[in-house]
């Protein structure tokens, strides 16, 4: 198969990606048989586990960046109760370098801007080239950042959820 997989989930993803059901890969890539796989493979995930992996990756690959594609600041009870602050703090502790938004915009544009200006300033770049003001279509956020990785300049372009204006 050439190129990238189309948006597929569950059994369809496993079939197209040629991944056997019941394997560790199937557990990592799908929601299928989650209870059974959780019993077999034990606890996975969580920010403590993620922090360990990020530290290992950055130690073994100097110049590596941690990118966040969104869906991070919302979705849990604690995120709801703290208006996303618990997850924002976790992102900073993990060492996220560059982020774009998805469901973060459900917090409201003012809250998102507040986080970027207060919590992320000088620490995390927030990029979203496709989020524009409704009146004149001006960019709301930086569209991209240039980061040098092992001497090579690389552009990281932010592509937020394209239906943000009507979904949130």
PLM features: residue spans?
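Acidic, metal/ion-coordinating pockets
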Residues: 1-168
């Amino acid at each position: 198969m050439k190129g990238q997989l189309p948006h597929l989930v569950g059994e369809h993803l496993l079939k197209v990606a040629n991944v056997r059901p019941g394997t560790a890969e199937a557990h990592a890539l799908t929601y299928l048989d989650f209870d059974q796989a959780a019993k077999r493979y034990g606890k996975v995930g969580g920010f403590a586990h993620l922090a360990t992996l990020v530290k290992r990756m950055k130690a073994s690959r100097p110049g590596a960046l941690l990118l966040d594609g969104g869906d991070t600041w919302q979705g849990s009870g604690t995120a709801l109760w703290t208006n996303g602050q618990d997850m924002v703090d976790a992102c900073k502790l993990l060492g996220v370098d560059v982020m774009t938004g998805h469901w973060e915009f459900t917090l409201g544009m003012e809250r998102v801007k507040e986080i970027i200006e207060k919590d992320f300033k000088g620490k995390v770049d927030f990029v979203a080239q496709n989020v524009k003001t409704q009146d004149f279509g001006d960019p709301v956020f930086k569209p991209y950042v240039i980061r040098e990785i092992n001497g090579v300049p690389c552009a990281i372009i932010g592509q937020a959820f394209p239906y943000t204006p009507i979904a949130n």
